[in-house]
Structure formats: C-alpha cells, structure tokens
Amino acid sequence: MQLPPALCARLAAGPGAAEPLPVERDPAAGAAPFRFVARPVRFPREHQFFEDGDVQRHLYLQDVIMQVADVPEKPRVPAFACQVAGCCQVFDALDDYEHHYHTLHGNVCSFCKRAFPSGHLLDAHILEWHDSLFQILSERQDMYQCLVEGCTEKFKTSRDRKDHMVRMHLYPADFRFDKPKKSRSPASAEAPGDSGERSEGEAMEICSEPVAASPAPAGERRIYRHRIPSTICFGQGAARGFKSNKKKTKQC
C-alpha cells in the first residue's frame, strides 16, 4: 500500500511539524457543518464539573474507613477446655482453640510427646531420634535432610545442615535448629545404680533398727516452738496429763 505524498512528507519531517494534514472530502458531500478544534479548558477545584466525582470519592473513602474501623469480632462461645488429656487450656473462641490445637497437638511425636509446628519437622524428628537404623545409614550416606519444607538437600552431619540453612535459607546463626542429645558418661550411668543400692540398704537398716538423729552442728542449735500447753504431758512415766498452775496453800 502506497502512502499519500503529504503523509510521507509529514512522517519524514518529524514531530516538529505543526501544520495539520490535509483532509480530502468528497465534493458531493458539500462543506462540513462544523469545524472542531481541540483546546484545553481549565476548571477551578470547586467547579460543578467535579461535583459527581467528589461525591463518589467521598462515599468510597467513607466505606473504606468503616471497613477498617469495624474489625469483625470472633464468635464467642461458652468457655470450654482443651479435649486433649493433660492440657488445661481454656478457650472462649473457636479460632483460638483451632490455633492452639494445630500448634501444640496437631503434630506430636508418639514416642516422646514433643509437639512440632509442621509434619515435615515431625518426620525429621522421628527419623533422627527414634529410628534405630538412622545412625547406621548416616555413616554410609547423607541422612540429615534440610528442615525447610520443599528443600531436598541432605547432609552428612547436623552441623553441615545448620551451615546450609544459615547460608542458603538466611536463618539466624543462633537459631535452635535441633535439640542435641545428652550423652551420659559412664560415671553418671553408674551413679543411679549405686545410689539405688545405697538407698535400698539404708531402707533395710531403718527397718531393722532405729537410726539416731544426727546432732546439729555447734552454733546452729535448733529452736522448736510448740503450741501444746505446758499443762499437758505425753509419754510413758510422765506426770498426770492436766496439771494445775495454782500453788497449793499450806495450812497452818
């Protein structure tokens, strides 16, 4: 398609040309009834032209403010306790109870009763803490999986996993990733047995013959305060139980 010469000249002249393009009209149509020329019109802010827009804007802002101010209240119900055995939490809103249940009772280890915020952490805990084959397999291959759900990386040790989470997932370095296992030394392992035997022996000695009470150290003599009246005496060979404080009058 070939463009008119005037249009080609207009395009070649660039944006600086201000002359309008010629419009060819059909001679049979006659002269144009009107001629439209665009010109800017400025209205003041309080002009009637903006009245409808101001009303709509005011209603819109009022509706937004009402929605922000009127925070929906949680449906209140009679206070009820958590249904899990051993939990004494009391709630008066269903949302609070659902949050409590999913946080503390939704993912609980059946072995040690520890609660976890997600099923992924619960599975990792059971695998690392309660699986007897985990330690054997960890010596041959990477078994410590990343604690971030969706990450499939596995590592040789828990320290390597922590470095990965700090470096790749931007976790804080002092974040408590996993609770370290407490290693019991041989001395501490033998201590309960010795103490058990000692306590059993002491119990047998106590049953056979009474053990004298150890005397109080010097300077720390115990002071006992009894609320029993001095006129009442207990024990074998004691004076009569009720003794009068009145002195006997001697008869001349």
From Swiss-Prot:
Cellular component, GO annotation: nucleus
Alphabetical UniProt keywords: DNA-binding, Metal-binding, Methylation, Nucleus, Repeat, Transcription, Transcription regulation, Zinc, Zinc-finger
Main localization (coarse): nucleus
InterPro entries: ZNF511, Znf_C2H2_sf, Znf_C2H2_type
Positions of the UniProt region annotated as Disordered: 177-221
Alphabetized GO MF terms: DNA binding; DNA-binding transcription factor activity; zinc ion binding
Modified positions (Omega-N-methylarginine) in chain numbering: 240
Source taxon at top rank: Eukaryota
Subcellular localization(s) per the UniProt record: Nucleus
Zinc fingers typed C2H2-type, residue spans: 80-105, 107-130, 144-169
PROSITE patterns from the UniProt entry: ZINC_FINGER_C2H2_1
SMART domains, alphabetized: ZnF_C2H2
Family: Belongs to the krueppel C2H2-type zinc-finger protein family.
Function: May be involved in transcriptional regulation.
UniProt protein name: Zinc finger protein 511
Organism: Homo sapiens
Gene symbol of the encoding locus: ZNF511
